[in-house]
Amino acid sequence: MIPGEIFPAEGEILLNAERMQVTLVVSNAGDRPVQVGSHYHFAETNPALDFDREAARGMRLDIPAGTAVRFEPGQTREVRLVSYAGAREVYGFNGRIMGKL
């Protein structure tokens, strides 16, 4: 083995395959772009984003870690969300949960 060498797995790797998923329509009703990162608790995003926040409780974007989705002013798009795993506790963000989901 060489330091830093990577041994990739064979075949396709499916991200979030076993997690509960939901698809929501999201509109940016604001006058500025809103960008949401991959692991942000989607129900607590910017209030300018219009969508079913209760359906998004305990969910995050189903995109690769470290990436984000940008919503331009007036833009409407569908997004797929996946449930948080592990202890299913949410702290920080906008402070609306601060504990178990």
UniProtKB/Swiss-Prot annotation:
The name this protein goes by in its record: Urease subunit beta
The protein's enzyme class: hydrolase
Keywords in alphabetical order: Cytoplasm, Hydrolase
Entry GO MF terms: urease activity
Pathway annotation: Nitrogen metabolism; urea degradation; CO(2) and NH(3) from urea (urease route): step 1/1
Keyword Ubl conjugation: no
Top-level taxon: Bacteria
Gene Ontology cellular-component terms listed: urease complex
Family membership noted in the UniProt record: Belongs to the urease beta subunit family.
Transmembrane parts of this sequence: none
SUPFAM superfamilies: Urease, beta-subunit
Subunit structure, as described in the record: Heterotrimer of UreA (gamma), UreB (beta) and UreC (alpha) subunits. Three heterotrimers associate to form the active enzyme.
CDD domains reported in the protein's UniProt record: Urease_beta
GO biological process, one term: urea catabolic process
